[in-house]
Structure formats: structure tokens, C-alpha cells
Amino acid sequence: MKNLHYIPHTHWDREWHKTFEAFRVRLCYSMEMMLDTLENDENFSYFMYDAQTSILEDYLTIYPENKDRLKKLVGEKRLFVGPWYTQPDFYLISGESLARNLLIGSNIADDMGHSMEVGYIPDSFGQAAQIPQIMKGFDLKSVYVWRGI
């Protein structure tokens, strides 16, 4: 018998075809729906918020009163955040910036209660040869990649 794992998640572009502020309005709306669902629907056990912590800062700038709600869900491992600060595009940056991105993101996630232990890279248009070395340095035992392989 094979196991099928369904992982509810979102990929979040901080800016893309709209402004940062336009996307932040959507972020706040989706974050509110996600929080309400995790807190009130016993059949919805966890959610992965794109492995980046900058979205927590963006949301908490508008709704700082919800920090404890987020911390509770992250600490219970029902809301997975980090280890990145922002999703990197490996074609545009150096190994040093990748390491610092992970350092900042994992520290923020740890402060919230838990940093996801997967090097989640769903939207990079290329990959760096140093990914295994960098992931090992942050004790990330697995990596999820999508395009650019």
C-alpha cells in the first residue's frame, strides 16, 4: 500500500504583477481565513505558508494583535513557516545571500515557535550547485524543488 500525503499550502509572491500593498491586502485576507480555519475546523490539522517568514512580518505590521495566535499554531506545528526569509531565485544571488536568507528566516521562525525543517524551493528559475552544502549547514535534511532543475 502506498501513502498519499496531502499538504495544504500556498505559494506567496510578495510582489509580482501587482504592488506590494495590493498583495498585502490579499495576504491579510488569506491569513485571516487560514487562522480561522486552523483554530475552528478540527479536520484541518495543518498548513504550510510557503516556507518564508517575511509574510509574517507583512501580516503582523497590519495585525500585531494576532501574533499570539500565529505563535500558538507555529509552536503546535500546525502552521509551518520558514526556513527562508523570502523565497530566493538562485539565478540572481550568491551563496552568501542564500545562507543569510536562511539564517534570518530560521531565526524568525524559531522565535515564532518552530522553523520548518525542509529546504522548500518551489519557485526558483534555477538551482545553485551549493544547495546541498547550504542545506546541510542549516541541518535541513530534505529539499523540495519545483522548476529550474
Give, region by region, the residue ranges found by the protein language model.
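Carbohydrate-active enzymes and regulators
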Residues: 1-149
